[in-house]
Regions:
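Short His-Asn-centered micro-motif
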Residues: 1-2, 101
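Central antiparallel beta-sheet cores of small beta-barrel/beta-sandwich binding domains
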Residues: 2-88, 117, 121
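A residue-level signal for beta-strand positions that form part of recognition/binding surfaces
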Residues: 17, 97, 113
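Low-complexity, intrinsically disordered Gly/Pro/Thr-rich segments
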Residues: 95-104
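Edge beta-strand at a domain terminus
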Residues: 104-129
Length: 129
């Protein structure tokens, strides 16, 4: 997903797994000029036709991450913009910045790292703590 266009809320489950769901979208509906203009964004690029109707808002896009040596490893990152799943890992760059990596290989050598900034005022986006 493009930078600054969404918020992913990451939570630790009772099992120890960290998951992330899309909690906010800058554009909840497809914009002007899009073939689905005015329609709520959904998982339209998913290869599985049964999943294409899932709404992006609330969609789990990070999962199966477990803490190991202060980092989160072993999971996945799903990109609803292209419908692809990547091996996932994450680590804190500093107190307010998470480095979330999606890679083609399990070791994380070939991929892309995206900086995620902590939301300090969730209410500004209509979110609760």
């Amino acid at each position: 997903m493009p930078d600054g266009k969404f918020i992913i809320k990451i939570d630790k489950q009772s099992s120890g797994e960290y998951i992330g769901k899309v909690a906010w979208l800058k554009m909840k509906y497809y914009g002007k000029g899009d073939k689905e203009e005015g329609v709520e964004q959904h998982d339209r690029n998913n290869k599985n036709s049964d999943l294409k109707s899932r709404k992006v808002l609330g969609l789990q896009v990070v999962g199966e991450l477990y803490e190991k040596n202060g980092n989160l490893k072993g999971g996945y990152v799903y990109d609803s913009w292209n419908g692809k799943m990547y091996y996932g890992s994450a680590k804190m760059d500093n107190e307010n910045t998470l480095l979330l990596r999606g890679s083609f290989d399990k070791k994380g050598i070939f991929g892309l790292t995206q900086k995620a900034k902590r939301v300090t005022d969730p209410s500004a986006y209509g979110l609760k703590d």
